[in-house]
């Protein structure tokens, strides 16, 4: 069967998908994809896979793709990060029989992508991207797609998209933020950029960004003219987003746990999903947050889910008519709803009106107001002091400024002490360095071995550079 392209690929292979679950590292695993498909998702992406590791490691391929084969999990697009055309194509060839298309990640803005030189940090290397897409388009039996972020300039974003289309990209997902817009600085995605790209290319376009409910999906399609809308954060907080429903948080949690029992995944994935799904409820019942963080088994997670369900039902029974949700939430905490990420100014020290936590610790010498991580450490180590005023003060090394050993005979740190003791053939019992003692023992032992002494005695060297002993041996 010939490889379908562009709109024919979108309409026939992908079934004209409009509701799409984004590729999310450690989050869009098989169990979550199946849950999302049950609630309106028409197309899913795998988590981003590292192309080089996928080619090199058979276990990585097995754990991240080959063991996750499920007839219900189609259509499916496998996403790779890569910066080498040959490696990208080799990985894609190994994956193409398990999916409907291969996607190249050109949108990841995280520091790990910068260090690895992939994702959004390739967006200025157009020649490299052209070679990667062209080679994949020529050699794969399935279409190649791309997920990108925008440039600040609309015209440059349009030229970028047209370059990828010309190289062989058959479907383009446009995240309407720049690579600098992330975390607290995420801001609002630009649908104007997405609209301009959609008008300028002749392939299907998916929009990504600012999608928190079904109304956002419909408005985005209407405003930009895209073929589909991709959701990441919104999907994590409400997997029923594409149905236009906001069910109780425990309802979707129980359904997800049932799927995980059939299609197991690492417990860290499960825990991360429930932290997102229960975000607002865990602000109210913080003890459950601690319990969820501690459990080590799926049964333990299910027990926490049951406890959360009972707490929420108690809150519902006490809820009085006419009372609005707390903290300006659009719905009560037990209802699936979007999470609005605080802006950079909301959490800044300038607006907090207080001093840093470390300064307060040093002044008060108390554990109040510390982070949960430090409180956990205190519980695990009850005899350890966290009061800075009680911590021992270390004198500095005379040479490098690092803390010196309290019992060092040279008043140095271990590194400097080792160099000096070796140079002077001296001992430092404080650091356990016994160069002098070991040398004396070695000489004393050799003195008791007359045969060894004779073997080590070398005769005068001949003009040719070899000792007479060596010369006679070669004769």
UniProtKB/Swiss-Prot annotation:
Q: Which cofactor does it need?
A: FMN
Q: Which GO terms describe its molecular function?
A: flavin adenine dinucleotide binding; tRNA-dihydrouridine16 synthase activity; tRNA-dihydrouridine17 synthase activity
Which stretches does the entry tag as region Disordered?
343-388
Specify one Pfam family: Dus
Q: Which reaction does it catalyse?
A: 5,6-dihydrouridine(16) in tRNA + NADP(+) = uridine(16) in tRNA + NADPH + H(+); 5,6-dihydrouridine(16) in tRNA + NAD(+) = uridine(16) in tRNA + NADH + H(+); 5,6-dihydrouridine(17) in tRNA + NAD(+) = uridine(17) in tRNA + NADH + H(+); 5,6-dihydrouridine(17) in tRNA + NADP(+) = uridine(17) in tRNA + NADPH + H(+)
Q: Name one GO biological process term.
A: tRNA dihydrouridine synthesis
Extent of Basic residues compositional bias: 373-383
GO cellular component terms given for this protein: cytoplasm; nucleus
Q: What is this protein called?
A: tRNA-dihydrouridine(16/17) synthase [NAD(P)(+)]-like
Q: Which species?
A: Mus musculus
What gene makes this protein? Dus1l
């Amino acid at each position: 069967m010939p490889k379908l392209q562009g709109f024919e690929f979108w309409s026939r292979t992908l079934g004209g998908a409009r509701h799409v679950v984004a590729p999310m590292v450690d989050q869009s695993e098989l169990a979550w994809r199946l849950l999302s498909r049950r609630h309106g998702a028409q197309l899913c992406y795998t988590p981003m896979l590292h192309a080089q590791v996928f080619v090199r490691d058979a276990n990585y391929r097995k754990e991240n793709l080959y063991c996750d084969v499920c007839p219900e999990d189609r259509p499916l697009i496998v996403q790779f990060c890569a910066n080498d055309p040959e490696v990208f194509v080799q990985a894609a060839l190994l994956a193409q029989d398990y999916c409907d298309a291969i996607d190249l990640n050109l949108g990841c803005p995280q520091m790990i992508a910068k260090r690895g030189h992939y994702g959004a940090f390739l967006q200025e290397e157009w020649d490299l991207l052209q070679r990667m897409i062209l080679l994949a388009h020529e050699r794969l039996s399935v279409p190649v797609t791309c997920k990108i972020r925008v440039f600040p300039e609309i015209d440059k974003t349009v030229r970028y998209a047209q370059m990828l289309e010309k190289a062989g990209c058959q479907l383009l997902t446009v995240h309407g933020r720049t690579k600098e817009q992330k975390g607290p600085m995420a801001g609002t995605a630009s649908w104007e950029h997405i609209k301009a790209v959609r008008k300028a290319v002749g392939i299907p376009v998916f929009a990504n960004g600012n999608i928190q409910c079904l109304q956002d999906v419909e408005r985005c399609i209407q405003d930009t003219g895209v073929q589909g809308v991709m959701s990441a954060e919104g999907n994590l907080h409400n997997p029923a987003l594409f149905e236009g429903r906001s069910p109780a948080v425990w309802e979707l949690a129980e359904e997800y746990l049932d799927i995980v029992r059939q299609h197991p995944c690492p417990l860290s994935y499960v825990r991360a999903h429930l932290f997102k799904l229960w975000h607002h409820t865990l602000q109210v019942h913080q003890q459950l947050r601690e319990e969820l963080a501690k459990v080590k088994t799926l049964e333990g997670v299910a027990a926490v889910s049951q406890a959360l369900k009972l707490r929420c039902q108690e809150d519902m029974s006490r809820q009085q008519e006419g009372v609005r949700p707390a903290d300006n939430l659009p719905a009560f905490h037990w209802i699936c709803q979007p999470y609005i990420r605080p802006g950079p100014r909301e959490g800044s020290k300038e607006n907090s009106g207080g001093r840093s936590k470390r300064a307060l610790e040093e002044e008060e010498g108390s554990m109040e107001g510390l982070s949960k991580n430090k409180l956990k450490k205190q519980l695990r180590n009850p005899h350890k002091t966290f009061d800075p005023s009680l911590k021992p003060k270390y004198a500095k090394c005379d040479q490098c400024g690092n803390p010196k050993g309290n019992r060092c005979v040279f008043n140095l740190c271990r590194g400097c002490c080792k160099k000096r003791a070796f140079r002077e053939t001296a001992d430092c019992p404080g650091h356990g360095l016994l160069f002098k003692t070991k040398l004396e023992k070695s000489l004393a032992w050799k003195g008791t071995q007359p045969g060894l002494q004779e073997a080590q005695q070398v005769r005068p060297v001949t003009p040719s550079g070899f000792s007479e002993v060596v010369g006679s041996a070669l004769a």
